């Protein structure tokens, strides 16, 4: 589960990490009030779960409370990558000398919490990994004792914080970040940038936190932070229908039963020269209504040029899936070509149901992927 920036900021503050002052506004007048309380220049930031807010005009500087009100009026209601801005964070504008990066993430290779730091903050860490990988410092926390003091100090020294006072403060922040990661059952806690102010002190200027949804039952206070309005409409509908759906950037929609088979399907589409438009797992035992909902979600993406059904009927009955596809197509007529690879329980009945439809049959996954790629290109 993603947290908004203001929620992440407040959570880090609970662990003793220095953060910017400010507050959240849902109206321009509230933004003006918060700016007046700060008493200086402020940054008004759109609170939506997407990157690229600044480039989209969702982050603006305001010198006065009146200007903060004007800026908030411009940002509130703005559409950024399909999400409507309903809240803005009004935070104090801070001058600084350096931008650093610090995060904690679960490293599945070492099966430990990996602490990552870099002297090149303020930009996407993935970009730093491409352009200057040596600037990224990684240290795994001890599996039972956590992040040790000497490890935190080593991170500080290796990113150029040679001043003793700065190194100690960085070590304290790194240790607090690790505690936040573990105690909140997070999958990512990131400060980017962690800035060095003019007086030499450190401050978390922007932050990102991802929580493990499977562990939220242990944290009702964190679960309460979930904002349904901040997630894309398709993902919200999928969650309500009990479907696992993640939108991607391709043009071939996928409906698969089982997460492993869904990932394999995406891989084969890529190997066939195509790009998957989504990850979608309808789960085991999916009935007609669930299949219908899944297809409607896939077709709601205007980028989808073809759909590939890859169903292996173990618990899931192939004829039930076929009925769901037919029912969905009756309610949502579409010209999008569809390829179906249906095998397993009641597959003969399922294929018979689809025989009179316009679906393109495929005997194997490889054949299905190749036909879906060709259909997306308009070659079928």
From Swiss-Prot:
Q: Which PROSITE patterns does the UniProt record give?
A: ATP_GRASP (PS50975), SUCCINYL_COA_LIG_3 (PS01217)
- List ligand-binding residues for Mg(2+): 192, 206
Q: Where does substrate bind?
A: 257, 314-316
InterPro entries xrefs: ATP-grasp, ATP-grasp_succ-CoA_synth-type, ATP_grasp_subdomain_1, Succ-CoA_synthase_bsu_CS, SUCC_ACL_C, Succ_CoA_ligase-like_bsu, Succinyl-CoA_synth-like
**Coiled coil stretches, renumbered:** none
> Which UniProt keywords are listed?
ATP-binding, Ligase, Magnesium, Metal-binding, Nucleotide-binding, Tricarboxylic acid cycle
Task: State one molecular function term (GO).
Answer: succinate-CoA ligase (ADP-forming) activity
The chemistry this enzyme catalyses reads: succinate + ATP + CoA = succinyl-CoA + ADP + phosphate; GTP + succinate + CoA = succinyl-CoA + GDP + phosphate
User: Pathway it acts in?
Assistant: Carbohydrate metabolism; tricarboxylic acid cycle; succinate from succinyl-CoA (ligase route): step 1/1
A Gene Ontology annotation in the biological process aspect, one of them, is:
tricarboxylic acid cycle
What EC designation does it have? 6.2.1.5
Mind telling me which GO cellular component terms the entry cites?
cytosol; succinate-CoA ligase complex
**Gene3D superfamilies attached to this UniProt entry:** ATP-grasp fold, A domain, ATP-grasp fold, B domain, Succinyl-CoA synthetase domains
Sites binding ATP sit at: 45, 52-54, 94, 99
The record, for HAMAP family, names: Succ_CoA_beta
Question: What's the protein here called?
Answer: Succinate--CoA ligase [ADP-forming] subunit beta
Organism name: Chloroflexus aurantiacus (strain ATCC 29366 / DSM 635 / J-10-fl)
Q: What is the lineage of its organism?
A: Bacteria, Bacillati, Chloroflexota, Chloroflexia, Chloroflexales
């Amino acid at each position: 589960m993603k947290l908004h920036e203001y929620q992440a900021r407040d959570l880090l503050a609970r662990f003793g990490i220095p953060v910017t002052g400010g507050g959240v506004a849902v109206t321009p007048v509230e933004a003006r009030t918060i700016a007046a309380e700060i008493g200086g220049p402020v940054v008004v930031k759109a609170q939506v779960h997407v990157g690229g807010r600044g480039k989209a005009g969702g982050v603006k500087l305001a010198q006065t409370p009146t200007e903060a009100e004007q800026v908030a009026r411009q940002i509130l209601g703005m559409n950024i990558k399909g999400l409507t801005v309903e809240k803005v964070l009004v935070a104090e504008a801070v001058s600084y000398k350096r931008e650093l990066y610090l995060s904690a993430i679960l490293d599945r290779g070492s099966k430990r919490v990996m602490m990552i730091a870099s002297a090149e903050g303020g930009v996407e860490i993935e970009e730093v990994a491409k352009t200057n990988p040596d600037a990224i410092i990684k240290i795994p926390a001890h599996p039972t004792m956590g992040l040790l003091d000497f490890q935190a100090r080593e991170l500080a020294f290796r990113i150029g914080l040679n001043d003793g006072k700065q190194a100690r403060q960085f070590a304290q922040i790194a240790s607090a970040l690790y505690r936040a990661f573990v105690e909140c059952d997070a999958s990512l806690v990131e400060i980017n940038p962690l800035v060095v102010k003019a007086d030499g002190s450190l401050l978390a200027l922007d932050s990102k936190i991802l929580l493990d949804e499977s562990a939220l039952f242990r944290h009702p206070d964190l679960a309460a932070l979930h904002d349904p309005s901040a997630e894309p409409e398709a993902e919200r509908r999928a969650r309500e229908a009990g479907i696992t759906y993640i939108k991607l950037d391709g043009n071939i929609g996928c409906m698969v039963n089982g997460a492993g088979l869904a990932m394999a399907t995406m891989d084969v589409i890529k190997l066939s020269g195509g790009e998957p438009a989504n990850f979608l797992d309808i789960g085991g035992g999916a009935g007609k209504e669930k299949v219908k909902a899944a297809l409607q979600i896939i077709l709601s993406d205007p980028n989808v040029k073809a759909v590939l059904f890859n169903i292996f009927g173990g618990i899931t009955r192939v004829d039930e899936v076929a009925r769901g596809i037919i029912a969905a197509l009756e309610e949502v007529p579409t010209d999008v070509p569809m390829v179906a690879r249906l095998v397993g329980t009641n597959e003969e009945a399922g294929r018979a149901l689809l025989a009179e439809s316009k679906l393109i049959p495929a005997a194997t996954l490889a054949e299905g992927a190749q036909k879906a790629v060709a259909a997306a290109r308009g070659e079928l």
